[in-house]
């Protein structure tokens, strides 16, 4: 399968999670890049110019909440849609994701069809 679709940046400190999401994305025809924490995500977002970012909430160095806030404050990256991923499905986490600027919120574990549908909804494709 040719992967010429939009580039998705996967930000998660867990290698297995990044590879699993990458496999889901490849199956749907998306390209993907990865970052291991929020700090690296800031750099990769500026250099790779992804169409969308999947952001884990809990990571070392800089968590996803802070990374999303900074990405949305930066004129160079504020236009990039973000989907926040977290193991916590509580309403307060959904509200926090919206407050920091995430465009969508998914609770882990994320099913492949659920992830693909949410990406397509956010990207309007």
Question: What residue spans do the PLM features occupy?
Answer:
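C-terminal output helix
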Residues: 110-119
């Amino acid at each position: 399968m040719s992967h010429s679709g939009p580039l998705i940046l996967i930000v998660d400190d867990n290698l297995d999670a990044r590879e699993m999401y990458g496999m889901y994305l490849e199956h749907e025809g998306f390209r993907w890049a990865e970052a291991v924490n929020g700090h690296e995500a800031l750099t990769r977002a500026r250099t790779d110019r992804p169409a969308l970012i999947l952001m884990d909430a809990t990571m070392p160095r800089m968590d996803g909440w802070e990374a999303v806030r900074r990405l949305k404050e930066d004129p160079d990256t504020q236009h990039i849609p973000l989907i926040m991923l977290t193991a916590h499905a509580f309403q307060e986490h959904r509200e926090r994701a919206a407050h920091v600027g995430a465009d969508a919120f998914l609770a882990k574990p994320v099913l492949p069809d659920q992830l693909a549908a949410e990406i397509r909804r956010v990207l309007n494709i």
